Amino acid sequence: MNGYSNPSVDAERLRMRTCSRQLRPAGAYYAARFSIGKDEEILCLRRLFSRGGNPLFLEKLVLPKHSAERKRVPLPERGSLWKLPLPGVHSTRQSLELVELERRDLRILRLREERAALCLEREYLDSEGRVIALQRVLIPEGGEEELIVER
């Protein structure tokens, strides 16, 4: 797989709402992903995209606070984080998998029952191969969202 895109992200009828933006300790999982200490802060941003009042997908961005401050990351008011130009990025690594939605994500997407989702993940790497940002798009199973996979 060479990449993937989400054509509706740029559609004019698509509405975006920032659900949360918080600084919090990295914890064990993100400390390992970003090669930082467990107590170092990370910036977590969640945005919901919908059409006609119906939630389509949830987009997440996670990056270390020191990285966001140093690079002055420009978070777009409209459009996808997927096209976010991050300074210092040497390469990216992408993956596509089926995951179970967390309770918080189910609530944001206004889903009442547990459901799987397609998870598109992109890691942004610096010149030394360290992860400097992590983006995820969660598309719920049974949704009307379209995805194009390039080979």
Where are these predicted regions, by residue range?
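A short glycine-rich, His/Asp/Glu-containing loop-to-beta-strand
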Residues: 14-17, 44-46, 51, 55-61, ...
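Solvent-exposed residues in well-ordered beta-strands and their adjoining turns
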Residues: 24, 50, 62-64, 99, ...
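A short beta-strand signature
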Residues: 39-52, 118-125
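A short, surface-exposed beta-strand/turn
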Residues: 58-67, 135-144, 150
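Short, structured loop/turn "capping" segments at alpha-beta junctions
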Residues: 55-56, 89-91
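Extended hydrophobic
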Residues: 92, 97-127, 131-138
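HTH-adjacent hinge/linker in prokaryotic transcriptional regulators
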Residues: 1-41, 66-90, 145-151
